[in-house]
Structure formats: C-alpha cells, structure tokens
A protein has these predicted regions:
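FAD-binding core of FAD-dependent oxidoreductases
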Residues: 61-75, 79-83, 90-115, 143-165, ...
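Cysteine-centered functional microenvironments
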Residues: 142-147, 326, 330
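Alpha-helix capping at helix-to-loop junctions
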Residues: 112-116, 132-140, 148, 166, ...
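A broadly conserved amphipathic alpha-helix scaffold signal in soluble, globular proteins
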Residues: 128-135, 155-158, 162, 225
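Polyanion/phosphate-binding surface patch
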Residues: 56-58, 73, 261
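Conserved, non-catalytic sequence blocks in retroelement Pol enzymes and Pol-derived host proteins
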Residues: 119, 148-150, 384
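Glycine-rich, flexible loop motifs
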Residues: 4-21, 25-57, 84-143
Length: 522
C-alpha cells in the first residue's frame, strides 16, 4: 500500500525514519523539515572527534591525506580546511541539462539525513543549512551527467554544495541566478570555507542516484496501479473472459504480485454489463489479456523489492571514512559504492518496460480487426478516408522499442578511475536516470492505451453487440477522459488529445478517481 505524500506537510529529519512517501513529500511537494535534537547532538559529538583527530595529526583519509590516488599524500593540519573546499571546487565537472528541482531537493534531503547519522564528523551547520535551503526554496543547479556512482555521486554533490559556499548557481522563486545571490535573497548566510572532513562529508554518498531512483520508483508504483485499471478498461472493450482471474488459479501458484493483480482485476471488472452479456465464443484469451496478473504481478513484485532497497538507502550513512565514538575509531570503507542501488534501479527500469510492453499489445489488439472481437478496423467509423487510431499504436510501439534499449543494465558496466584506485564502479546514477526515462515512455504508452480503450468502448456501444454498461468506475474514468478528449468521429489533429491524457496519467488524478470507488485499491 502506498500513501499519498501530499498529506505529509512536515517531517523531522533524524537520520533513520524517512519513508518513500515522506521523501516524495519533501522533494516534490515542499513539505517543511526540521532537524531532530537527537541528530544535532550526535553530529556535535562526531565533529568533536574529527577535530581531535585533525589536531593530533592522526592519519585519516580525507582529513590528513589527499583523495583518491592522493591518499598517500599527507596534508598538514593547517591545510585541512583548504583540502575540503578544494574538493568541492575541483569536483564540480558535471555536464548536460540540469536535474529537475525535485531531484536536487531530494539530493539535499538525503545528504542531510545521512549526515544526521552522527558518524561523518561534519559540523551541524551543514545540515542546518541544507534544511533551511529546503524550507526557503533555494535549489542548486546540478547538471545530470558525470557520476560513476562510486565514490558515490561526487560530481553532482559537489555542484549541490557550491551555493552553500556562495558559488555556483541556484534556482530561487523560479529564476536561475548565481548561488550567492539566491542565498542572499533567501536570507541564508553562506560559509566562507568548509573545514576538515566536510568536503568528503558533502560529496561521498549515493544521494543523486537515490533521489532520481526514489522519485522514479514512486511514479512507477503509481503507473503500475494505473496499469491495472487501464488494462481492465481495455479488457472490457475487448470483451475478455474473466475466468482467467479466478482466485483459485492464482492461489495455487502463490506469487504475491500475481494474486494482488488478479484481485484488482476482479474488483475492477465486477458489474460490467458488457462482459456479462458478451458471447462466450472462445475458451481463453490471448496472453495480453489472460495473463495480466502474471505480467503485471511480476512487475509489482519487482517494485516491492526495489522499494525495500530504496527505503534502506534513504536512511543510510554512505560517507567515508566513518567515525565511531566508542573507541574513537576512524575506519575507511566503501559505503559510498552505488552497487546496492545500481542493481535495483536496473530492475526498476526493466519492470517499467514490461508494463509498457503489455500495454502496447492490448492497444494493438483493440485497433486490429483480426484480434478485437468485432471492433472496427483502427476504431474508425469511416475506414479508408480516416486512419483512426492506426498511428497511436505506432507511437506506442516506438516507445516500447526505445525502452528495450534503455532497459539494458547499466550495472553490468564499469570503468576504472583515479589511476585505478577506484577500479570498479557501479554506474548506479546511470541506472536511475535510465529508469526515469523508461518510466516516462511507459506513462505515455499507458496514455495511448487509455485513449484507445475509451474509443473502443464507444465503438462497442455503437455496434450494440453487447450490453451498454461499463463498471461504475470505468464509466467515471471514461467520462473524465471525455471531458477533454472527444470521440473520434473523423480524423483530427490528435497530438493535443494525447498530451491531455498523458497529463492525466502523470498528475495522479486518475488514481484519485479509482480510490473514490475502490478505497482499498493497491
């Protein structure tokens, strides 16, 4: 079950209690944040240990040494502040279009939450500043390309940190401006410098990939729920056979997602006059209809797995080295490595791609007179002079094929960096970015199917070969679409209608209607 993040208005950031919904509430819907007192105290103690280590001149990576291949180079304690600041300045090398504000806000939140763990040795002011920027709407400009996903998301996080130093660029009140100007307009005092360990503390972590991937995950969960609904409308338009959703079939297999989707289909199709009165002239349907629980259910199981991993990472400490107060140990490790996220985000993209595959096949069945159980060719009333929905299916097929390219796993790739000190990397940020691109295509493919299903229902009613009545929910969704997209009597400019339905898919308004009729819908 996924709750509505817009209901969450305020979140206490403590390092261990973020959920997917509270993350989305802050990153996308601007829920306010505050620092938990317990996290503040933990960071103060951790910072005291970092200062003690620096003062004693103990060998500690990134505090008294250089970075990467320069780990063997000793840095005098009087240069430790410059070391941290230089790390930010030298690492902001990203390229490409900037991330959307919601993704950067997610990065800021995740960095703050990780530092709240109290083992990174940074001053609390860094977290306080990040949370103040979130509350006041200062969003650093962060280009999308340049992260290998190990050592974490160094490049994007360096760009994220620049405005805190009065550098770089930021968005404020919808306008891009120099970072110093944005901070001044918001009334946030910038830092003159970072101090020892803080360069690593701000950049060593998986915050960019996790922000991109977590938002894509939330949207894919919503798309999967809506995928069941749209599939059921197509099923009704194609007069499918409901016996494929008999619970006994699914219980004997025992796959959780499959059983959930089968239950959804039974709820969604209950009370359909069209299906109650259709001719039973076949024993079973094609896979795209009969196997909706198996196809969509497998995607649901994949999303459950990805959610489990993401919610761990939302509250993870992904810095290096880490400091433990009980024995004053400073331990170098690899929590920054993105592999634990790279594989799930590849899986996320594959699951979203499969949803689109199934959707496009249902669209094809509705427009193909050989497969549609009596619908007109391409759902037009004047064949030949009108092409109807012929090219709607083309567009869906194009996006499905594009998804197959994007679905190739990023995590199987690696490339050495930093003179082979960082010799195997995760490409987790690439995996997350690909998953988002696949999701966007999938949302558009579902929009094509929904438009086609509404046209198919109208054609079915005109032919009057079965009862006229859809289920009450389907009727409500149909009417909602028809408020903006009229029946296609003759060909007309179609792209504005496609954009309108795509907007319905992305806004969440269709799921709101579903939950009015089926409150426990999952």
């Amino acid at each position: 079950m996924i709750m509505n993040p817009t209901a969450i208005k305020h979140v206490v950031v403590d390092g261990h209690s973020l959920t997917l919904e509270s993350f989305v509430a802050i990153a996308r819907y601007n829920a306010t944040v505050e620092l938990a007192p317990s996290a503040l105290e933990a960071m103060k103690k951790s910072r005291a240990l970092a200062e003690k280590i620096a003062a004693e001149g103990r060998v500690a990576y990134g505090i008294t040494t250089g970075f990467g291949e320069f780990q063997k180079v000793a840095v005098p304690k009087e240069m430790s502040n410059q070391l941290s600041t230089n790390l930010i300045l030298s690492h902001c090398t990203a390229a490409g279009e900037p991330y959307a504000d919601e993704i950067v806000r997610g990065m800021m939140l995740l960095r703050a939450n990780a530092l709240c763990g109290g083992v990174s040795g940074v001053r609390p002011i860094l977290v306080e500043m990040l949370l103040e920027m979130l509350n006041k709407g200062v969003t650093p400009v962060v280009p999308q390309k340049g992260s290998l996903g190990s050592s974490g998301d160094l490049t994007p996080l360096a760009h994220m940190t620049l405005p805190m130093l009065g550098k770089g660029e930021a968005m404020y009140e919808g306008v891009k401006m120099p970072g110093a100007e944005a901070m001044a307009k918001a009334g946030i005092k910038t830092l003159d410098t970072l101090v020892s360990k803080e360069g690593l503390g701000m950049t060593n972590g998986t915050c960019a990939m996790t922000s991109v991937g977590a938002l894509a995950l939330y949207d894919t969960i919503c798309a999967a729920q809506l995928g069941d609904v749209i599939a059921s409308m197509s099923f009704e338009g194609l007069t499918g056979l409901r016996n494929a959703f008999d619970p006994r079939i699914h219980q004997v297999r025992g796959q959780k997602g499959q059983m959930l989707v089968a239950a959804n289909m039974r709820k969604l199709l209950d009370g359909s006059e069209i299906l109650d009165n259709c001719q039973k002239d076949r024993v079973q349907d094609a896979y795209a209809l009969r196997c909706i629980p198996q196809l969509h259910g497998a995607c649901r199981d994949a999303l459950d797995y990805v959610r489990e991993k993401v919610e761990i990472e939302l509250n993870a400490v992904t810095d290096n080295p880490l400091m433990f107060l009980d024995d004053e140990a400073v331990i170098s490790g690899g929590n920054f490595h993105g592999e634990p996220m790279a594989l799930p985000f590849d899986f996320l993209g594959i699951a979203a791609s499969e949803l689109a595959d199934a959707s496009e096949r249902r669209t094809e069945r509705m427009v193909n007179p050989a497969l549609s159980n009596g619908l007109t060719a391409f759902l037009t009333t004047q064949a030949g002079v009108n092409s109807g929905f012929m090219i709607v299916q083309y567009a869906a097929a194009s996006m499905v094929s594009e998804n197959k390219i994007y679905a190739h796993p990023a995590s199987v790739d690696s490339i050495p960096s930093s003179a082979n000190q960082e010799d195997i990397v995760s490409m987790g940020t690439t995996a997350a970015r690909k998953a988002k691109m696949i999701l966007q295509n999938t949302q558009d493919v579902l929009a094509d199917e929904l438009m086609t299903a509404c046209q198919a229902i109208d054609i079915r009613r005109r032919l009057n070969t079965h009862g006229q009545g859809m289920t009450p929910l389907h009727e409500a969704l149909y009417q909602h679409v028809r408020e903006k997209v009229a029946f296609y009597e003759i060909d007309r400019e179609i792209w504005p209608d496609i954009r309108a339905v795509e907007a319905m898919i992305r806004s969440g308004e269709l799921l709101d209607i579903v939950k009015e009729y089926i409150p426990d819908f999952e």
